[in-house]
Amino acid sequence: MSVAAQVAHASPLAPVFERYHVGWETRNPDLIASLHSEDTIFWLHDGSDPVKGRDALRRHCAGLFAAFNFSFEMGRRLYGEDHWIFEWTMILSLAEPDGSPFTARVEMLDVVTVNRRGEVARKDVYMNGKQAEEAFARAGIKR
């Protein structure tokens, strides 16, 4: 086991991450929202406004899952006292305007703050803008 993996498993936030990630892997807005605080902030830094509150987050996630078919390629996880940083790659199944399917890869970075109750209080998501722009343009999606 690598040193990074040993550190990840030693963090008290590792089990919180694991439960949280299951929500995303299974595309379950209710599970994801249940692990956030009532006053949570979820912010995809792509020019859009932050999503504020657990109920708004649940709706936002449901919309994401309805609009996009994506999976995860896991990268590094770094833990602090009240946060984790997660590098991952989004694997998007998209189609060109003529219907031809293609797969796009977009590098992502999550910065997640956890409150004293073990709830996700804030999640900031950063994406590789160039990769995302190229994928969406190829699919004819205007963002």
Indicate residue ranges for each PLM-predicted region.
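A beta-strand edge to alpha-helix "cap/lid" segment located at domain peripheries
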Residues: 2-12, 58-143
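A generic signature of intrinsically disordered, low-complexity regions enriched in glycine/proline
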Residues: 22-25, 34, 50-53, 114, ...
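A solvent-exposed, acidic/Ser-Thr-rich amphipathic alpha-helical stretch
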Residues: 10, 14, 22, 29-81
